[in-house]
Amino acid sequence: MSIEDVGIKPSEEYDDYIMYLKKRIRQLELQVRTLEADKERLERELSRLRMEMSRLRQPPAFAGTLIELLDEDRAIVQNYNGPRFVVRIAPWIERENLKPGARVALDQRTMAIVELLPSEKDPSVLGFEVIERPTVSYNDIGGLDKQLQELREAIELPLKHPELFEKVGIEPPKGVLLYGPPGCGKTLMAKALAHEVNATFIRVVGSELVRKFIGEGARLVHELFELAKEKAPAIIFIDEIDAIGAKRMDETTGGEREVNRTLMQLLAEMDGFDPSGNVKIIAATNRPDILDPALLRPGRFDRLIEVPLPNFKSRLEILKIHTKRMNLKGVDLRIIAEMTEGASGADLKAITMEAGMFAIRDRREYVTQEDFLKAIEKVLGSEQRLSQQIAMHEVMYG
């Protein structure tokens, strides 16, 4: 390329031409760097694809169980329902993670341990974990101050301040059993505790642990506690525990024997975990009279908390909580609390909801005393029915 090609006359100074060449050189250098960067990126992508292709071409591995570690390089493994082998351990396997009972991948040719597999769990057990923290707080519970204090001392305090128990020299409670009539706030207390404590909350209903085939219920209980240990700190909440914790009888059917196996596994798991650890268990029932005595002894459920029907003061607190966002006009909550003797917390919530529905039915934006009177009649029924409910609760719960 000459001076004439770029339009510069021979008589002109060569400085402009030199500046043009320098600018052109910078442009070419920039293009070279861009192409080199693209080349490196494509080489990395090619390397990744080759590695992926190499992995896909590898033969499948056997799944087995680690039985025993012999030394740093050898172990005894067992293929599922097969013989046992003394095999080598691949150098890239972290030895501290190899424990008896762990699931491992075995090479097809040499049977060497080439990978540590995650523990096997039933999908239903994984579904017990509550991902979203409940929105219920302690302020949403009325009339249960004493019960909340006992629950927080037994569950929340050991998780947040374990050093207090070490200084005093005692072991914290392993578990808490909440018992009382239906609708009195047992499940609500557990939800509030999960909201306040920064821990994994695992909720399961007792009937979900009852299975048709032999050994399935016991396996679910074992995997439930294994999940809690992996997710620690964790709280296991078993609602309606009487479904698996009823008293064992001498004469049983096949289904009852399976329930008894599930109960025995639960007892074994509760005996097995450390009370000073980060796993706590809460259970709830409205039939404490039918629970197996082995479940209630100290060392399993160390604290039994009764959640009774609310008295007048408690009913007034519950009504204030449920009506704090309602537009009331001329409503005396003390009268409502006096008229609802024998009602549970769930009944009181239903009464406030029905009172609001009566106001909406009349196209009003406020709730009156008359609305509450109608709601009491609808929810609790006649005085005779109400007295029958009170008598039934007294017979059942004393």
Curated annotation (Swiss-Prot):
Keywords: ATP-binding, Chaperone, Coiled coil, Cytoplasm, Nucleotide-binding, Proteasome. The keyword Nucleotide-binding applies. Residues 396-398 are annotated as: Docks into pockets in the proteasome alpha-ring to cause gate opening. Homohexamer. The hexameric complex has a two-ring architecture resembling a top hat that caps the 20S proteasome core at one or both ends. Upon ATP-binding, the C-terminus of PAN interacts with the alpha-rings of the proteasome core by binding to the intersubunit pockets. Belongs to the AAA ATPase family. It is found in: Cytoplasm. ATPase which is responsible for recognizing, binding, unfolding and translocation of substrate proteins into the archaeal 20S proteasome core particle. Is essential for opening the gate of the 20S proteasome via an interaction with its C-terminus, thereby allowing substrate entry and access to the site of proteolysis. Thus, the C-termini of the proteasomal ATPase function like a 'key in a lock' to induce gate opening and therefore regulate proteolysis. ATP binds at G183, C184, G185, K186, T187, L188, H322. PROSITE patterns: AAA. GO terms for molecular function: ATP binding; ATP hydrolysis activity. GO terms for biological process: proteasomal protein catabolic process; protein unfolding. GO terms for cellular component: cytoplasm; proteasome-activating nucleotidase complex. It comes from the Archaea. SMART domains: AAA. Residues 18-59 form a coiled coil. The keyword Transferase does not apply. Its main location: cytoplasm. SUPFAM superfamilies: P-loop containing nucleoside triphosphate hydrolases. It comes from Thermococcus onnurineus (strain NA1). Consists of three main regions, an N-terminal coiled-coil domain that may assist in substrate recognition, an interdomain involved in PAN hexamerization, and a C-terminal ATPase domain of the AAA type. This is Proteasome-activating nucleotidase.
